[in-house]
């Protein structure tokens, strides 16, 4: 039997770089919220112990794909602790809507959905804490998708505190470029000393993203989309880009602006949600 699982996008409602560690990783403060929009992952169980991704992602080797790595990691961890039946495997396919290098967390979300779904389908019985710990070895953003609740994140993004920001409507626009995260984090002009503040203080301040100034400077497409959106609503970069988003109180307001968008602006309208669609599907 084939089952389908949501793999939602996320937005960074704000993102501040507070320092850089000796190992080169940046410390940050950010606010994650999910969107009711994303990829869909389909899983069909196998009984020969094999993991097969039936829909390869262009430019990514099969064994390097986060979906495959997540499945193999869960398989090994569960088998080593005697919590996996012999022969457990899976055929996995993905209906991909989220762009790569867009700052929407697509790859991390895919990995998290596979961990959560296969843990359920294989009846491994691993806790969310165990799955989140495994997810962190795959990427800093994976744990928030595993846990499935909007969160304030610190450290390198791994220290999570559940929060409930307002669930606004967003027009999310993709400028048509992919921004590799290292391009932003290696830029010498990236602000790296934003003062740390409490979540209570941050929620009262106007939200912004320290990476935005670099993305706009290095990618004129990002600058063009943001300049257009800012004419209509508060707008900013998500993650390290390339996607940007404008914030609205209602769906109709967001759709009215999207309808006026120039042809070169590709976007969609989605609602911010504090409970991940993946976890909502499991209730």
UniProtKB/Swiss-Prot annotation:
Keyword Glycoprotein in the entry? The reply is no
Is the keyword Repressor in the record? no
Q: Which reaction does it catalyse?
A: 4-CDP-2-C-methyl-D-erythritol + ATP = 4-CDP-2-C-methyl-D-erythritol 2-phosphate + ADP + H(+)
- Record keywords: ATP-binding, Isoprene biosynthesis, Kinase, Nucleotide-binding, Transferase
EC number assigned by the record: 2.7.1.148
Name the top EC class: transferase
Instruction: Give any GO molecular function from the UniProt entry.
Output: 4-(cytidine 5'-diphospho)-2-C-methyl-D-erythritol kinase activity
| Entry binding sites for ATP | 99-109
Could you mention a single GO BP entry for this protein?
A: isopentenyl diphosphate biosynthetic process, methylerythritol 4-phosphate pathway
Q: In which pathway does it act?
A: Isoprenoid biosynthesis; isopentenyl diphosphate biosynthesis via DXP pathway; isopentenyl diphosphate from 1-deoxy-D-xylulose 5-phosphate: step 3/6
Active-site residues annotated for this sequence: 10, 141
Note the subunit structure.
Homodimer.
State the NCBIfam families in the record. Answer: ispE (TIGR00154)
Q: Which PANTHER family match?
A: 4-DIPHOSPHOCYTIDYL-2-C-METHYL-D-ERYTHRITOL KINASE, CHLOROPLASTIC (PTHR43527:SF2)
Q: What does this protein do?
A: Catalyzes the phosphorylation of the position 2 hydroxy group of 4-diphosphocytidyl-2C-methyl-D-erythritol.
For this chain, the family text in UniProt reads:
Belongs to the GHMP kinase family. IspE subfamily.
What name does the UniProt record give this protein? 4-diphosphocytidyl-2-C-methyl-D-erythritol kinase
What organism does this protein naturally occur in? Escherichia coli O6:H1 (strain CFT073 / ATCC 700928 / UPEC)
Give me the gene this protein comes from: ispE
